[in-house]
Amino acid sequence: MTCETPAAPTRFTLELIKGALNAARSEMEALIARAAMSPFIREKKDFFTAFLNRDGELVVSTSLTLAGNLVDAILEEYPAETMRPGDLYWFNDVYGTGGAVSHLPDMVFVMPVFHEGRLFAFAEAWGHLWDIGGSVPGSISPHAISVFQEGIMIPPVRVMREGVENKEVVRIFTRNSRFPDMLRGDLRAIMAACRLGAHRLTETVERHGVEVVEAAFEAMLAETEGALRAEIAARIPDGEYAFRDRIDSDAVTDRSYFVDLVLRKGGGALEMDFSASDRQADGPINFLMDDSVPKFMLGLWMCMDRPGIGMNGGFERAVERIVTRPGTLVAPRFPAPLGLRSHTMIRVTSALFGTLARATGGQASAAPSVYVLYYLRGRNADGTEPLCIEGLSVGFGARTFADGIDAVYYVAQENYPIEFAEMEFGVEIEAFGIHRDSGGAGRWRGGCGIVRDVRVLSDEARFGIRLDNCRQPAFGVHGGLAGAPGRVVVNPDGANPRDIATMGDGIRLEKGDLVRIITPGGGGWGNPADRPAEDVLADVLDGFVSKEAAAGDYGVELAGDRVDLEATLARRAAMARPSKMFHRGRYYDADEDRPDAFTASATAGKG
Protein backbone atom coordinates (compact mmCIF):
# COMPACT_ATOMS: atom_id res chain seq x y z
CA MET A 1 0.00 0.00 0.00
CA THR A 2 1.26 3.48 -0.85
CA CYS A 3 0.26 6.94 0.23
CA GLU A 4 -2.45 8.80 -1.67
CA THR A 5 -1.18 11.75 -3.70
CA PRO A 6 -3.98 14.30 -3.97
CA ALA A 7 -1.75 17.32 -4.59
CA ALA A 8 1.35 16.87 -6.71
CA PRO A 9 4.12 19.31 -5.74
CA THR A 10 5.92 21.37 -8.34
CA ARG A 11 9.53 20.39 -9.04
CA PHE A 12 10.67 23.45 -7.15
CA THR A 13 8.56 22.57 -4.11
CA LEU A 14 9.69 18.95 -4.27
CA GLU A 15 13.33 20.01 -4.09
CA LEU A 16 12.57 22.33 -1.17
CA ILE A 17 10.94 19.46 0.73
CA LYS A 18 13.83 17.10 -0.11
CA GLY A 19 16.27 19.66 1.21
CA ALA A 20 14.27 20.22 4.38
CA LEU A 21 14.05 16.49 5.10
CA ASN A 22 17.74 15.87 4.45
CA ALA A 23 18.70 18.83 6.60
CA ALA A 24 16.45 17.59 9.40
CA ARG A 25 17.94 14.11 9.22
CA SER A 26 21.46 15.56 9.35
CA GLU A 27 20.43 17.64 12.36
CA MET A 28 19.22 14.46 14.09
CA GLU A 29 22.61 12.86 13.42
CA ALA A 30 24.47 15.87 14.78
CA LEU A 31 22.41 15.77 17.96
CA ILE A 32 23.18 12.08 18.51
CA ALA A 33 26.89 12.56 17.85
CA ARG A 34 27.09 15.46 20.32
CA ALA A 35 24.93 14.04 23.10
CA ALA A 36 25.68 10.29 23.11
CA MET A 37 28.19 8.88 25.60
CA SER A 38 29.46 5.60 24.14
CA PRO A 39 32.47 5.44 21.80
CA PHE A 40 30.54 3.42 19.22
CA ILE A 41 28.03 6.20 18.73
CA ARG A 42 29.93 9.35 19.66
CA GLU A 43 33.20 8.62 17.84
CA LYS A 44 32.53 5.79 15.39
CA LYS A 45 29.14 7.18 14.30
CA ASP A 46 27.46 3.77 14.39
CA PHE A 47 23.93 5.13 14.20
CA PHE A 48 21.23 5.78 11.64
CA THR A 49 18.40 8.27 11.18
CA ALA A 50 15.48 8.27 8.76
CA PHE A 51 11.99 9.44 7.90
CA LEU A 52 9.28 7.05 6.76
CA ASN A 53 5.83 7.61 5.29
CA ARG A 54 2.72 6.50 7.16
CA ASP A 55 2.92 3.05 5.54
CA GLY A 56 6.45 2.54 6.87
CA GLU A 57 8.27 3.02 3.56
CA LEU A 58 11.69 4.63 3.92
CA VAL A 59 11.60 8.11 2.37
CA VAL A 60 14.84 9.76 3.51
CA SER A 61 17.81 7.99 5.11
CA THR A 62 21.59 7.85 5.24
CA SER A 63 23.43 7.00 2.03
CA LEU A 64 24.02 3.46 3.27
CA THR A 65 20.70 1.91 4.19
CA LEU A 66 20.74 -1.75 5.19
CA ALA A 67 17.98 -1.81 7.80
CA GLY A 68 14.81 -3.84 7.42
CA ASN A 69 11.19 -2.71 7.73
CA LEU A 70 11.21 -0.63 10.89
CA VAL A 71 7.50 0.02 11.35
CA ASP A 72 5.49 -3.13 10.54
CA ALA A 73 6.44 -4.95 13.74
CA ILE A 74 5.40 -1.92 15.80
CA LEU A 75 2.07 -1.61 13.99
CA GLU A 76 1.33 -5.29 14.65
CA GLU A 77 1.54 -4.61 18.39
CA TYR A 78 0.29 -1.02 18.39
CA PRO A 79 -2.17 -0.29 15.54
CA ALA A 80 -1.93 3.16 14.01
CA GLU A 81 -5.30 4.22 15.42
CA THR A 82 -3.97 3.71 18.98
CA MET A 83 -0.96 5.99 18.48
CA ARG A 84 -0.83 9.52 19.83
CA PRO A 85 1.41 12.57 19.30
CA GLY A 86 4.44 12.25 21.59
CA ASP A 87 4.44 8.44 21.57
CA LEU A 88 7.80 6.71 21.10
CA TYR A 89 8.38 3.02 20.33
CA TRP A 90 11.49 0.98 20.96
CA PHE A 91 12.92 -2.45 20.03
CA ASN A 92 16.01 -4.49 19.27
CA ASP A 93 14.41 -7.95 18.92
CA VAL A 94 15.81 -9.36 15.67
CA TYR A 95 13.65 -12.47 15.49
CA GLY A 96 10.55 -10.79 16.88
CA THR A 97 10.65 -8.14 14.14
CA GLY A 98 11.58 -10.40 11.23
CA GLY A 99 15.01 -8.86 10.76
CA ALA A 100 14.01 -5.18 11.03
CA VAL A 101 17.24 -4.88 13.01
CA SER A 102 20.09 -7.30 12.42
CA HIS A 103 21.74 -7.81 15.82
CA LEU A 104 20.81 -6.99 19.40
CA PRO A 105 23.15 -4.03 20.13
CA ASP A 106 21.35 -1.97 17.45
CA MET A 107 18.54 -0.28 19.39
CA VAL A 108 15.71 1.21 17.30
CA PHE A 109 13.42 4.12 18.27
CA VAL A 110 10.45 5.18 16.13
CA MET A 111 8.16 8.18 16.73
CA PRO A 112 4.86 8.66 14.86
CA VAL A 113 4.27 12.18 13.53
CA PHE A 114 0.81 13.73 13.29
CA HIS A 115 -0.85 16.73 11.69
CA GLU A 116 -4.19 17.81 13.08
CA GLY A 117 -4.63 14.41 14.68
CA ARG A 118 -3.80 12.36 11.55
CA LEU A 119 -0.71 10.15 11.32
CA PHE A 120 1.34 11.05 8.24
CA ALA A 121 4.94 9.93 8.92
CA PHE A 122 7.48 8.42 11.31
CA ALA A 123 10.82 9.74 12.56
CA GLU A 124 13.34 7.02 13.36
CA ALA A 125 16.81 6.66 14.85
CA TRP A 126 18.90 3.77 16.05
CA GLY A 127 22.35 3.33 17.51
CA HIS A 128 24.75 0.52 18.39
CA LEU A 129 24.87 0.44 22.19
CA TRP A 130 28.11 -0.33 24.04
CA ASP A 131 26.86 -3.14 26.30
CA ILE A 132 23.38 -4.66 26.69
CA GLY A 133 24.27 -7.63 28.88
CA GLY A 134 25.05 -11.08 27.55
CA SER A 135 27.92 -13.44 28.21
CA VAL A 136 30.78 -10.96 27.76
CA PRO A 137 31.39 -7.21 28.19
CA GLY A 138 30.36 -5.56 24.95
CA SER A 139 27.68 -8.22 24.39
CA ILE A 140 29.22 -9.62 21.18
CA SER A 141 31.39 -12.72 21.32
CA PRO A 142 32.64 -14.82 18.39
CA HIS A 143 32.02 -17.87 20.61
CA ALA A 144 28.28 -17.27 21.16
CA ILE A 145 26.09 -20.25 20.27
CA SER A 146 22.72 -18.68 21.16
CA VAL A 147 21.17 -15.24 20.81
CA PHE A 148 20.47 -15.39 24.56
CA GLN A 149 24.24 -14.98 25.10
CA GLU A 150 24.22 -11.72 23.14
CA GLY A 151 22.21 -9.49 25.46
CA ILE A 152 18.70 -8.52 26.47
CA MET A 153 15.96 -8.64 23.82
CA ILE A 154 13.39 -5.82 23.71
CA PRO A 155 10.27 -6.55 21.63
CA PRO A 156 8.41 -3.54 20.22
CA VAL A 157 7.29 -1.57 23.29
CA ARG A 158 5.96 1.93 23.86
CA VAL A 159 8.63 3.71 25.87
CA MET A 160 6.87 7.07 25.79
CA ARG A 161 3.14 7.87 25.82
CA GLU A 162 2.17 11.40 24.75
CA GLY A 163 5.58 12.67 25.81
CA VAL A 164 5.73 10.87 29.17
CA GLU A 165 8.56 8.35 29.47
CA ASN A 166 8.00 4.85 30.84
CA LYS A 167 10.91 5.01 33.27
CA GLU A 168 10.31 1.47 34.56
CA VAL A 169 11.05 -0.05 31.15
CA VAL A 170 14.23 2.01 30.81
CA ARG A 171 15.33 1.07 34.33
CA ILE A 172 14.90 -2.66 33.63
CA PHE A 173 16.94 -2.32 30.45
CA THR A 174 19.83 -0.33 31.92
CA ARG A 175 20.01 -2.71 34.90
CA ASN A 176 21.10 -5.41 32.46
CA SER A 177 24.12 -3.44 31.25
CA ARG A 178 27.63 -3.37 32.70
CA PHE A 179 27.74 0.33 31.74
CA PRO A 180 24.30 1.66 32.77
CA ASP A 181 25.20 5.36 32.88
CA MET A 182 26.71 5.23 29.39
CA LEU A 183 23.68 3.34 28.14
CA ARG A 184 21.30 5.84 29.70
CA GLY A 185 23.10 8.70 27.98
CA ASP A 186 22.90 7.00 24.59
CA LEU A 187 19.19 6.31 25.01
CA ARG A 188 18.54 9.95 25.88
CA ALA A 189 20.44 11.12 22.79
CA ILE A 190 18.57 8.81 20.40
CA MET A 191 15.18 9.61 21.92
CA ALA A 192 15.90 13.33 21.66
CA ALA A 193 16.83 12.89 18.00
CA CYS A 194 13.45 11.30 17.30
CA ARG A 195 11.68 14.22 18.98
CA LEU A 196 13.75 16.66 16.95
CA GLY A 197 12.97 14.82 13.72
CA ALA A 198 9.25 14.80 14.48
CA HIS A 199 9.38 18.54 15.18
CA ARG A 200 11.14 19.26 11.88
CA LEU A 201 8.62 17.14 9.97
CA THR A 202 5.80 19.09 11.58
CA GLU A 203 7.44 22.37 10.56
CA THR A 204 7.72 21.13 6.98
CA VAL A 205 4.03 20.24 6.90
CA GLU A 206 3.05 23.60 8.36
CA ARG A 207 5.07 25.31 5.64
CA HIS A 208 3.85 23.31 2.63
CA GLY A 209 0.69 21.48 3.72
CA VAL A 210 0.30 17.82 4.62
CA GLU A 211 -1.12 16.80 1.23
CA VAL A 212 1.82 18.33 -0.61
CA VAL A 213 4.35 16.72 1.74
CA GLU A 214 2.72 13.30 1.38
CA ALA A 215 2.70 13.74 -2.39
CA ALA A 216 6.39 14.66 -2.20
CA PHE A 217 7.05 11.44 -0.28
CA GLU A 218 5.41 9.45 -3.07
CA ALA A 219 7.25 11.38 -5.78
CA MET A 220 10.59 10.65 -4.11
CA LEU A 221 9.80 6.94 -3.87
CA ALA A 222 8.58 6.79 -7.47
CA GLU A 223 11.68 8.61 -8.72
CA THR A 224 13.99 6.11 -7.03
CA GLU A 225 11.92 3.14 -8.20
CA GLY A 226 11.98 4.41 -11.77
CA ALA A 227 15.73 4.99 -11.69
CA LEU A 228 16.50 1.46 -10.51
CA ARG A 229 14.04 -0.15 -12.94
CA ALA A 230 15.68 1.76 -15.79
CA GLU A 231 19.16 0.62 -14.72
CA ILE A 232 18.02 -3.01 -14.43
CA ALA A 233 16.40 -2.90 -17.88
CA ALA A 234 19.46 -1.33 -19.49
CA ARG A 235 22.23 -3.33 -17.83
CA ILE A 236 20.97 -6.81 -16.89
CA PRO A 237 19.95 -9.08 -19.79
CA ASP A 238 17.13 -11.57 -19.29
CA GLY A 239 18.44 -14.86 -17.89
CA GLU A 240 19.73 -16.58 -14.77
CA TYR A 241 23.07 -15.76 -13.17
CA ALA A 242 24.48 -17.48 -10.11
CA PHE A 243 27.39 -17.02 -7.75
CA ARG A 244 28.53 -18.44 -4.44
CA ASP A 245 30.90 -16.82 -1.96
CA ARG A 246 32.33 -18.27 1.23
CA ILE A 247 32.89 -17.09 4.81
CA ASP A 248 36.07 -18.36 6.49
CA SER A 249 34.33 -19.88 9.53
CA ASP A 250 31.69 -19.22 12.17
CA ALA A 251 34.29 -19.03 15.02
CA VAL A 252 32.67 -21.99 16.80
CA THR A 253 33.39 -24.67 14.21
CA ASP A 254 36.26 -24.69 11.72
CA ARG A 255 34.10 -25.15 8.63
CA SER A 256 33.41 -22.47 6.07
CA TYR A 257 29.90 -21.38 5.10
CA PHE A 258 28.63 -20.13 1.77
CA VAL A 259 26.10 -17.58 0.57
CA ASP A 260 24.50 -18.64 -2.71
CA LEU A 261 22.62 -16.23 -4.96
CA VAL A 262 20.75 -16.83 -8.21
CA LEU A 263 19.66 -13.67 -10.00
CA ARG A 264 16.73 -14.21 -12.38
CA LYS A 265 15.41 -11.60 -14.80
CA GLY A 266 12.56 -12.01 -17.24
CA GLY A 267 9.56 -10.06 -18.44
CA GLY A 268 10.83 -6.93 -16.73
CA ALA A 269 10.80 -8.61 -13.30
CA LEU A 270 13.82 -9.37 -11.13
CA GLU A 271 14.14 -12.13 -8.53
CA MET A 272 17.00 -12.72 -6.10
CA ASP A 273 17.09 -16.31 -4.83
CA PHE A 274 19.23 -17.16 -1.78
CA SER A 275 17.54 -20.48 -1.02
CA ALA A 276 20.58 -22.62 -1.88
CA SER A 277 22.71 -20.88 0.76
CA ASP A 278 24.38 -22.98 3.45
CA ARG A 279 22.60 -24.12 6.59
CA GLN A 280 22.53 -21.75 9.55
CA ALA A 281 25.79 -21.61 11.48
CA ASP A 282 26.53 -22.84 14.97
CA GLY A 283 28.41 -19.60 15.65
CA PRO A 284 27.18 -15.99 15.42
CA ILE A 285 27.61 -15.27 11.69
CA ASN A 286 23.89 -15.86 11.02
CA PHE A 287 22.06 -13.00 9.30
CA LEU A 288 18.26 -12.80 9.49
CA MET A 289 18.02 -10.89 6.23
CA ASP A 290 14.99 -8.70 5.69
CA ASP A 291 13.86 -8.68 2.05
CA SER A 292 14.70 -5.00 1.79
CA VAL A 293 18.43 -5.52 2.37
CA PRO A 294 19.48 -7.13 -0.95
CA LYS A 295 17.13 -4.76 -2.77
CA PHE A 296 18.91 -1.77 -1.26
CA MET A 297 22.30 -3.32 -2.00
CA LEU A 298 21.35 -3.64 -5.66
CA GLY A 299 19.94 -0.12 -5.78
CA LEU A 300 22.94 1.45 -4.07
CA TRP A 301 25.33 -0.18 -6.53
CA MET A 302 23.34 0.38 -9.71
CA CYS A 303 22.47 4.01 -8.91
CA MET A 304 25.72 5.09 -7.25
CA ASP A 305 26.62 7.33 -10.20
CA ARG A 306 23.27 9.14 -9.97
CA PRO A 307 23.71 11.44 -6.95
CA GLY A 308 20.29 13.02 -7.33
CA ILE A 309 18.53 9.72 -6.66
CA GLY A 310 17.41 9.26 -3.07
CA MET A 311 18.33 6.10 -1.18
CA ASN A 312 14.81 5.14 -0.17
CA GLY A 313 12.08 2.52 -0.34
CA GLY A 314 11.74 2.96 -4.08
CA PHE A 315 14.51 0.38 -4.36
CA GLU A 316 12.22 -2.14 -2.65
CA ARG A 317 9.45 -1.52 -5.15
CA ALA A 318 11.76 -2.13 -8.11
CA VAL A 319 12.69 -5.73 -7.21
CA GLU A 320 9.80 -8.16 -7.38
CA ARG A 321 10.91 -11.06 -5.22
CA ILE A 322 13.48 -12.20 -2.67
CA VAL A 323 13.63 -15.95 -1.98
CA THR A 324 15.16 -17.46 1.17
CA ARG A 325 14.82 -20.83 2.88
CA PRO A 326 14.24 -21.16 6.65
CA GLY A 327 17.14 -22.67 8.54
CA THR A 328 19.83 -21.21 6.27
CA LEU A 329 22.56 -18.65 6.90
CA VAL A 330 20.34 -15.80 5.67
CA ALA A 331 17.12 -17.07 7.29
CA PRO A 332 18.19 -18.66 10.60
CA ARG A 333 15.77 -20.09 13.10
CA PHE A 334 15.50 -18.74 16.65
CA PRO A 335 17.63 -18.77 18.80
CA ALA A 336 20.66 -18.94 16.48
CA PRO A 337 23.29 -16.32 17.42
CA LEU A 338 23.56 -13.19 15.26
CA GLY A 339 26.32 -10.99 16.69
CA LEU A 340 28.72 -11.32 13.74
CA ARG A 341 26.05 -11.10 11.05
CA SER A 342 28.19 -8.59 9.14
CA HIS A 343 30.36 -11.47 7.88
CA THR A 344 27.37 -12.88 6.05
CA MET A 345 25.96 -9.47 5.11
CA ILE A 346 29.18 -8.56 3.29
CA ARG A 347 29.15 -11.96 1.56
CA VAL A 348 25.61 -11.18 0.36
CA THR A 349 27.11 -8.04 -1.19
CA SER A 350 29.97 -9.93 -2.84
CA ALA A 351 27.62 -12.66 -4.11
CA LEU A 352 25.52 -9.91 -5.66
CA PHE A 353 28.62 -8.44 -7.33
CA GLY A 354 29.50 -11.92 -8.61
CA THR A 355 26.10 -12.45 -10.22
CA LEU A 356 26.17 -8.96 -11.72
CA ALA A 357 29.64 -9.60 -13.13
CA ARG A 358 28.32 -12.69 -14.86
CA ALA A 359 25.26 -10.84 -16.11
CA THR A 360 27.18 -7.86 -17.47
CA GLY A 361 30.41 -9.37 -18.78
CA GLY A 362 32.43 -8.20 -15.81
CA GLN A 363 30.93 -4.73 -15.38
CA ALA A 364 30.57 -5.03 -11.61
CA SER A 365 32.67 -4.14 -8.60
CA ALA A 366 35.17 -6.57 -7.13
CA ALA A 367 34.54 -8.04 -3.69
CA PRO A 368 35.07 -6.02 -0.50
CA SER A 369 36.58 -7.44 2.68
CA VAL A 370 34.60 -7.75 5.91
CA TYR A 371 35.29 -4.96 8.38
CA VAL A 372 37.07 -5.99 11.59
CA LEU A 373 36.30 -5.68 15.30
CA TYR A 374 38.55 -6.56 18.20
CA TYR A 375 37.76 -6.69 21.91
CA LEU A 376 40.27 -6.15 24.70
CA ARG A 377 38.77 -6.79 28.12
CA GLY A 378 41.29 -5.67 30.70
CA ARG A 379 41.66 -6.23 34.43
CA ASN A 380 43.88 -4.24 36.78
CA ALA A 381 45.07 -4.79 40.34
CA ASP A 382 42.99 -1.82 41.52
CA GLY A 383 39.81 -3.58 40.37
CA THR A 384 39.15 -1.52 37.25
CA GLU A 385 38.18 -3.43 34.11
CA PRO A 386 38.66 -1.28 31.00
CA LEU A 387 36.82 -2.41 27.89
CA CYS A 388 38.20 -1.66 24.44
CA ILE A 389 36.02 -2.41 21.42
CA GLU A 390 37.54 -1.02 18.27
CA GLY A 391 36.44 -1.31 14.68
CA LEU A 392 39.29 -1.57 12.19
CA SER A 393 39.17 -0.64 8.54
CA VAL A 394 39.74 -2.90 5.54
CA GLY A 395 39.98 -2.51 1.77
CA PHE A 396 36.88 -2.34 -0.40
CA GLY A 397 36.71 -3.82 -3.88
CA ALA A 398 37.78 -1.90 -6.95
CA ARG A 399 34.99 -0.38 -8.99
CA THR A 400 34.62 -0.45 -12.77
CA PHE A 401 35.74 3.18 -12.93
CA ALA A 402 37.91 3.76 -9.84
CA ASP A 403 40.14 2.14 -7.25
CA GLY A 404 38.57 0.54 -4.21
CA ILE A 405 38.36 2.60 -1.04
CA ASP A 406 41.43 2.23 1.19
CA ALA A 407 41.26 1.77 4.95
CA VAL A 408 37.52 2.09 5.48
CA TYR A 409 35.50 0.52 8.30
CA TYR A 410 32.11 1.04 6.74
CA VAL A 411 31.19 3.75 4.29
CA ALA A 412 28.90 5.65 6.65
CA GLN A 413 31.09 5.27 9.77
CA GLU A 414 34.41 6.54 11.09
CA ASN A 415 37.57 5.17 12.68
CA TYR A 416 38.57 6.06 16.24
CA PRO A 417 41.25 8.74 16.44
CA ILE A 418 44.37 7.25 18.00
CA GLU A 419 44.44 9.88 20.73
CA PHE A 420 40.89 9.00 21.71
CA ALA A 421 41.57 5.24 21.75
CA GLU A 422 44.61 5.65 23.98
CA MET A 423 42.82 7.96 26.38
CA GLU A 424 39.61 5.93 26.56
CA PHE A 425 40.73 2.30 26.44
CA GLY A 426 43.99 2.04 28.34
CA VAL A 427 46.00 0.88 25.33
CA GLU A 428 48.86 2.33 23.36
CA ILE A 429 48.66 2.43 19.57
CA GLU A 430 52.26 2.06 18.42
CA ALA A 431 51.66 1.84 14.68
CA PHE A 432 48.85 2.56 12.26
CA GLY A 433 49.45 2.36 8.54
CA ILE A 434 48.54 0.83 5.21
CA HIS A 435 48.82 -2.93 4.66
CA ARG A 436 51.02 -2.67 1.59
CA ASP A 437 50.10 -4.89 -1.38
CA SER A 438 46.81 -5.90 0.21
CA GLY A 439 44.65 -4.28 -2.48
CA GLY A 440 44.16 -6.69 -5.37
CA ALA A 441 46.10 -5.65 -8.47
CA GLY A 442 44.06 -4.52 -11.46
CA ARG A 443 43.37 -1.77 -13.95
CA TRP A 444 41.66 -0.40 -10.88
CA ARG A 445 43.38 -1.42 -7.67
CA GLY A 446 41.47 -2.90 -4.76
CA GLY A 447 41.42 -0.87 -1.57
CA CYS A 448 44.17 -1.61 0.95
CA GLY A 449 43.66 -2.79 4.50
CA ILE A 450 45.63 -1.50 7.46
CA VAL A 451 48.22 -2.58 10.04
CA ARG A 452 47.56 -1.56 13.65
CA ASP A 453 49.86 -2.34 16.59
CA VAL A 454 48.08 -2.31 19.96
CA ARG A 455 50.10 -2.47 23.21
CA VAL A 456 48.30 -3.92 26.24
CA LEU A 457 48.59 -1.64 29.31
CA SER A 458 46.20 -3.48 31.64
CA ASP A 459 47.71 -5.89 34.17
CA GLU A 460 46.04 -8.72 32.28
CA ALA A 461 43.54 -8.92 29.45
CA ARG A 462 41.38 -11.20 27.37
CA PHE A 463 41.45 -10.60 23.64
CA GLY A 464 38.78 -11.39 21.06
CA ILE A 465 38.65 -10.65 17.36
CA ARG A 466 36.50 -11.16 14.28
CA LEU A 467 38.66 -10.95 11.17
CA ASP A 468 37.45 -12.66 8.00
CA ASN A 469 38.87 -12.96 4.45
CA CYS A 470 41.90 -14.90 5.64
CA ARG A 471 41.08 -18.22 3.96
CA GLN A 472 38.76 -16.65 1.40
CA PRO A 473 40.24 -13.30 0.32
CA ALA A 474 38.08 -10.78 -1.52
CA PHE A 475 37.90 -11.92 -5.15
CA GLY A 476 38.99 -9.89 -8.16
CA VAL A 477 36.84 -9.37 -11.26
CA HIS A 478 37.45 -9.13 -15.01
CA GLY A 479 41.16 -9.87 -14.75
CA GLY A 480 41.78 -8.19 -11.40
CA LEU A 481 43.54 -10.11 -8.63
CA ALA A 482 42.12 -11.02 -5.24
CA GLY A 483 42.96 -8.91 -2.21
CA ALA A 484 45.52 -10.11 0.31
CA PRO A 485 44.31 -11.90 3.47
CA GLY A 486 44.51 -10.65 7.04
CA ARG A 487 46.45 -11.94 10.05
CA VAL A 488 46.88 -11.38 13.81
CA VAL A 489 50.29 -11.74 15.51
CA VAL A 490 51.21 -11.30 19.18
CA ASN A 491 54.66 -9.79 19.83
CA PRO A 492 55.65 -9.95 16.14
CA ASP A 493 59.11 -8.50 16.74
CA GLY A 494 59.80 -10.42 19.95
CA ALA A 495 61.67 -13.63 20.58
CA ASN A 496 58.53 -15.76 20.39
CA PRO A 497 56.00 -14.27 17.98
CA ARG A 498 52.74 -16.21 17.68
CA ASP A 499 49.86 -16.11 15.28
CA ILE A 500 46.47 -16.30 16.93
CA ALA A 501 43.02 -17.20 15.65
CA THR A 502 41.44 -14.53 13.49
CA MET A 503 37.98 -15.55 14.75
CA GLY A 504 38.24 -16.12 18.49
CA ASP A 505 37.67 -14.84 22.00
CA GLY A 506 39.08 -15.19 25.50
CA ILE A 507 42.71 -15.19 24.32
CA ARG A 508 44.89 -14.39 27.33
CA LEU A 509 47.33 -11.49 27.08
CA GLU A 510 49.73 -9.95 29.59
CA LYS A 511 50.72 -6.39 30.30
CA GLY A 512 53.19 -5.22 27.68
CA ASP A 513 52.10 -7.65 24.97
CA LEU A 514 51.82 -6.12 21.52
CA VAL A 515 49.09 -7.29 19.15
CA ARG A 516 49.61 -6.60 15.45
CA ILE A 517 46.34 -6.71 13.52
CA ILE A 518 46.72 -6.88 9.74
CA THR A 519 43.45 -6.42 7.89
CA PRO A 520 42.63 -7.70 4.37
CA GLY A 521 42.29 -5.77 1.14
CA GLY A 522 39.64 -5.62 -1.55
CA GLY A 523 39.70 -7.32 -4.92
CA GLY A 524 41.04 -5.63 -8.03
CA TRP A 525 39.17 -4.97 -11.28
CA GLY A 526 40.55 -5.36 -14.80
CA ASN A 527 43.89 -6.56 -16.12
CA PRO A 528 46.75 -5.18 -13.96
CA ALA A 529 48.82 -4.69 -17.12
CA ASP A 530 46.30 -2.07 -18.25
CA ARG A 531 46.90 0.18 -15.24
CA PRO A 532 48.85 3.26 -16.29
CA ALA A 533 52.47 2.86 -15.24
CA GLU A 534 52.47 6.33 -13.67
CA ASP A 535 49.56 5.28 -11.41
CA VAL A 536 51.55 2.24 -10.31
CA LEU A 537 54.55 4.46 -9.60
CA ALA A 538 52.36 6.78 -7.52
CA ASP A 539 51.10 3.79 -5.51
CA VAL A 540 54.69 2.69 -4.85
CA LEU A 541 55.76 6.16 -3.74
CA ASP A 542 52.68 6.45 -1.50
CA GLY A 543 53.25 3.07 0.16
CA PHE A 544 50.26 1.18 -1.25
CA VAL A 545 52.25 -1.10 -3.58
CA SER A 546 55.77 -2.50 -3.21
CA LYS A 547 58.37 -2.35 -5.99
CA GLU A 548 58.24 -6.15 -6.15
CA ALA A 549 54.46 -6.15 -6.69
CA ALA A 550 54.76 -3.34 -9.22
CA ALA A 551 56.98 -5.58 -11.32
CA GLY A 552 55.39 -8.95 -10.56
CA ASP A 553 51.69 -8.03 -10.62
CA TYR A 554 51.59 -4.93 -12.83
CA GLY A 555 54.62 -5.46 -15.06
CA VAL A 556 56.00 -2.04 -14.17
CA GLU A 557 59.78 -1.76 -13.82
CA LEU A 558 61.06 1.15 -11.79
CA ALA A 559 64.41 2.89 -11.88
CA GLY A 560 64.58 4.79 -8.63
CA ASP A 561 61.59 7.13 -8.49
CA ARG A 562 60.65 6.87 -12.15
CA VAL A 563 59.23 4.32 -14.57
CA ASP A 564 61.69 2.42 -16.76
CA LEU A 565 59.47 2.60 -19.83
CA GLU A 566 61.46 0.29 -22.08
CA ALA A 567 61.72 -2.46 -19.45
CA THR A 568 58.04 -2.01 -18.55
CA LEU A 569 56.88 -2.41 -22.15
CA ALA A 570 58.98 -5.53 -22.55
CA ARG A 571 57.76 -7.07 -19.31
CA ARG A 572 54.10 -6.32 -20.05
CA ALA A 573 54.40 -7.76 -23.54
CA ALA A 574 55.44 -11.07 -21.99
CA MET A 575 52.58 -11.17 -19.46
CA ALA A 576 49.65 -13.49 -20.15
CA ARG A 577 46.28 -11.78 -20.40
CA PRO A 578 43.65 -13.30 -18.10
CA SER A 579 40.67 -14.83 -19.91
CA LYS A 580 38.49 -15.85 -16.96
CA MET A 581 36.12 -13.70 -14.96
CA PHE A 582 37.20 -14.08 -11.32
CA HIS A 583 40.39 -14.47 -9.31
CA ARG A 584 40.99 -15.92 -5.88
CA GLY A 585 44.29 -17.76 -5.76
CA ARG A 586 43.77 -18.57 -9.45
CA TYR A 587 41.57 -17.37 -12.29
CA TYR A 588 38.24 -19.13 -12.71
CA ASP A 589 34.82 -18.78 -14.29
CA ALA A 590 32.74 -21.31 -12.34
CA ASP A 591 32.90 -21.68 -8.57
CA GLU A 592 34.94 -24.68 -7.48
CA ASP A 593 32.03 -26.21 -5.58
CA ARG A 594 29.38 -25.02 -8.01
CA PRO A 595 30.28 -26.03 -11.58
CA ASP A 596 26.84 -25.05 -12.86
CA ALA A 597 27.08 -21.53 -11.49
CA PHE A 598 27.59 -19.79 -14.82
CA THR A 599 24.02 -20.65 -15.81
CA ALA A 600 21.27 -21.54 -13.37
CA SER A 601 21.55 -23.10 -9.94
CA ALA A 602 20.61 -26.77 -9.90
CA THR A 603 19.96 -26.65 -6.17
CA ALA A 604 18.19 -23.33 -5.75
CA GLY A 605 15.01 -23.68 -3.77
CA LYS A 606 15.79 -27.21 -2.62
CA GLY A 607 16.53 -28.37 0.88
Model-identified regions with their sequence ranges:
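Glycine/proline-enriched, intrinsically flexible loops and inter-domain linkers
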Residues: 2-85, 90, 94-115, 119-606
